[in-house]
């Protein structure tokens, strides 16, 4: 028997979700930007999904943006933030154990002249908050730490990290990749 150990990243679709997706793909497939009936129906599905996600995160619907997935979201967040804040500094902090969707755009930014600091982790995969405190400086524009590691499941102390970052440099933007945490770890964007 095959043991599937990547359930947090890719989970089998529930029957209920599958049935709804088949209905949408076969019957309610209108362009949600169109004004005709099928488009309006498709838009309603999107609004309902946005509302449900916002409720789980205690966020406002306008704060929820849909992309094709985590990689696109992380690329937009990291590259966009770094390039938009380049005049404020060129230092970015991350960890040694980030997902490729974080590591790859940071490698690109390094090639563009940004200085990247990678925090080490202990034997359990946790960062040192003291090392983070020492790393944040006046030129630090961005810190990116995943909330739950996709390979070993380590839960990082992101709420504590947020406090340290804001204490050391209130202008530093804190990016948290919470893809693995959604639905399993209790958090909201307000707790960061």
Segments predicted by a language model, with ranges:
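Conserved PLP-anchoring active-site segment centered on the Schiff-base-forming lysine
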Residues: 81-103, 115, 120
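Conserved small/polar residues in nucleotide/adenosyl-binding loops
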Residues: 188-192
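Alpha-helical structural signal in soluble globular domains
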Residues: 20, 24, 45, 52, ...
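Short acidic capping loops at alpha-helix termini that bridge into adjacent secondary structure
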Residues: 60-64, 88-90, 138-139, 171
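Conserved N-terminal alpha-helix of the aminotransferase class I/II PLP-enzyme fold
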Residues: 33-72, 76
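N-terminal "arm"/small-domain region of PLP-dependent enzymes with the aminotransferase-like
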Residues: 1-34
């Amino acid at each position: 028997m095959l043991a599937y150990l990547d359930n947090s990243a890719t989970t089998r679709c529930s029957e209920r979700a599958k049935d709804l997706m088949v209905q949408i793909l076969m019957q309610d497939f209108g362009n949600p930007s169109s004004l005709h009936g099928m488009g309006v129906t498709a838009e309603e599905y999107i609004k309902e999904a946005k509302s449900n996600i916002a409720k789980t995160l205690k966020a406002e619907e306008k704060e929820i943006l849909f992309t094709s997935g985590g990689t696109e979201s992380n690329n937009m967040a990291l590259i966009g933030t770094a390039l938009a804040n380049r005049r404020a500094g060129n230092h970015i902090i991350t960890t040694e154990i980030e997902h490729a969707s974080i590591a790859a755009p940071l490698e690109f930014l390094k090639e563009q002249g940004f200085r990247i600091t990678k925090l080490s982790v202990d034997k359990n995969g946790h960062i040192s908050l003291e090392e983070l405190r020492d790393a944040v400086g006046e030129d630090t524009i961005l810190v990116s730490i995943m909330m739950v590691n996709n390979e070993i499941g380590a839960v990082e102390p992101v709420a504590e990290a947020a406090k340290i970052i804001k204490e050391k440099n209130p202008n530093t933007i804190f990016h948290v990749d919470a893809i693995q945490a959604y639905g399993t770890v209790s958090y909201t964007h307000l707790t960061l």
